[in-house]
């Protein structure tokens, strides 16, 4: 257990940040799964800008790595283009 006031505060901050990051990472994963489950091209095209925006914001705030965001966006765009 931490003994210093500052280290106790750091523990509180890290826990709060961890929960915040977990929430947004899970939300991102669910949104990507929902887009991948879509078989209708029009619906997928409508969803894609929102997913892309979410990935960019999460990469900007270091919740996910920028390369992971780029890879996901690329794969989702390829998936949408293959839909009939």
From Swiss-Prot:
Record field: transmembrane: none
The record's listing under SUPFAM superfamilies reads: Ribosomal protein S20
Q: Which InterPro entries match?
A: Ribosomal_bS20, Ribosomal_bS20_sf
Which UniProt keywords are given for this protein, alphabetically ordered?
Answer: Ribonucleoprotein, Ribosomal protein, RNA-binding, rRNA-binding
Q: What are the GO cellular component annotations?
A: cytosol; small ribosomal subunit
Any Gene Ontology biological process: translation
Q: Recorded GO terms, molecular function?
A: small ribosomal subunit rRNA binding; structural constituent of ribosome
For this chain, the family text in UniProt reads: Belongs to the bacterial ribosomal protein bS20 family.
- Give the PANTHER family listed for this entry: 30S RIBOSOMAL PROTEIN S20 (PTHR33398), SMALL RIBOSOMAL SUBUNIT PROTEIN BS20C (PTHR33398:SF1)
Annotated HAMAP family: Ribosomal_bS20
* Functional description taken from the UniProt entry: Binds directly to 16S ribosomal RNA.
User: What's the protein name?
Assistant: Small ribosomal subunit protein bS20
Give the species. Phocaeicola vulgatus (strain ATCC 8482 / DSM 1447 / JCM 5826 / CCUG 4940 / NBRC 14291 / NCTC 11154) (Bacteroides vulgatus)
């Amino acid at each position: 257990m931490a003994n210093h006031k500052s280290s106790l505060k750091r523990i509180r901050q890290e826990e709060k940040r961890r929960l915040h990051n977990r929430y947004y990472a899970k939300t991102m994963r669910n949104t990507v799964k929902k887009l991948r489950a879509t078989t209708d091209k029009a619906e997928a095209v409508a969803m894609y800008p929102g997913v892309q925006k979410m990935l960019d914001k999460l990469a900007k705030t270091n919740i996910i790595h920028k390369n992971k965001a780029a890879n996901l966006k690329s794969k989702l765009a390829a998936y949408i283009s293959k839909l009939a």
